[in-house]
Amino acid sequence: MQNQLNALLQSAKKSVADAQSEIVLEEIRVDYLGKKGKLTELLKSVGQMPADQRPLLGKAVNEIKREIQQLLNAKSTQLREKSLQEKLNKEKVDITLRGRYDHLGAIHPISRVSERVSQLFSMLGFQIAEGPEIENEYYNFEALNIPADHPARTMADTFYFSGDKLLRTHTSPVQIREMEKQGVPIRLIALGRVYRRDLDQTHTPMFHQVEGLVIDKRSTFANLKGLLQQFLNCFFEKDVRLRFRPSYFPFTEPSAEVDIYQPRTDKWLEVLGCGMVHPNVLRNLNIDPDEYSGFAFGIGLDRLAMLRYEVTDLRLFFENDLRFLGQF
């Protein structure tokens, strides 16, 4: 019987050594150590041996059983370590490889400027108003003292729909609508997209504008100048040098255009138009110009963005080139 035990042990050693998976290893355990396994059958036959041999044979069977179990445990540990190493090798990160770049979105520079302008004017006590981009001729022109023969009302400068509908050429109509609703005194800005038939290095058919309006009983041109100086100083985060030039706008009188001095180029650059609200505009809204006065101003947000970010071509903001937009 000892020979049978030795042969069984050698067979088990070979089977365990050849096993390449935990599943096969479990099959070997059942084949040798299970209830109907080979070693279990030998153990049953010990009872048929002479009484004086039974203790020695029983001890030999148990030792072989223990040795086979140790072989199975050692092989199981080896297979688990091998499986783990293979998994780690597949997941291994080569730290010398160039990392992946995540393309993150960002706020458009025009939107940044718009948010900054809104924030600053809110701090100065202005309410923020919005209105429709598709307007009629009354709100876009007539209420603002722009007569029918004014050049701005021609097909060459304005985008018209059928009837008297058009794409607004400025955000001034918002001011008219708000004065109709709220009356006076009033202090507001209107931001949004406006449209004109123009395209070159400093103009686009669609651009962004902020217009401000103050109507009260003691509004003066000096108030207007002080407000614009304070706003532009805050926006550019430095003291800026302004120049007011006489100009003409149908809805303001007197009117002026405002230039900012550029020390780097030693030049003046126009940034906005402004003036005292024309008495006819007040009369159109049943406001007595002898009792109330006011001032208005209009600033191109795109022009402010050009100055703030030192961009030379306005069209770059609208070409959706991520190489350009990613700089802001």
From Swiss-Prot:
It catalyses: tRNA(Phe) + L-phenylalanine + ATP = L-phenylalanyl-tRNA(Phe) + AMP + diphosphate + H(+). Belongs to the class-II aminoacyl-tRNA synthetase family. Phe-tRNA synthetase alpha subunit type 1 subfamily. Its cofactor is Mg(2+). GO terms for biological process: phenylalanyl-tRNA aminoacylation. The keyword Magnesium applies. It is found in: Cytoplasm. GO terms for cellular component: cytoplasm. Its EC number is 6.1.1.20. GO terms for molecular function: ATP binding; magnesium ion binding; phenylalanine-tRNA ligase activity; tRNA binding. Binds 2 magnesium ions per tetramer. This is Phenylalanine--tRNA ligase alpha subunit. Keywords: Aminoacyl-tRNA synthetase, ATP-binding, Cytoplasm, Ligase, Magnesium, Metal-binding, Nucleotide-binding, Protein biosynthesis. Mg(2+) binds at E253. Transmembrane segments: none annotated. The gene is pheS. The keyword Chloroplast does not apply. It comes from the Bacteria. Tetramer of two alpha and two beta subunits. InterPro entries: aa-tRNA-synth_II (IPR006195), aa-tRNA-synth_II/BPL/LPL (IPR045864), Phe-tRNA-synth_IIc_asu (IPR004529), Phe-tRNA_ligase_II_N (IPR004188), Phe_tRNA_ligase_alpha1_bac (IPR022911), Phenylalanyl-tRNA_Synthase (IPR002319), tRNA-bd_arm (IPR010978). Signal peptide: none annotated. It is an enzyme of class 6 (ligase). PROSITE patterns: AA_TRNA_LIGASE_II.
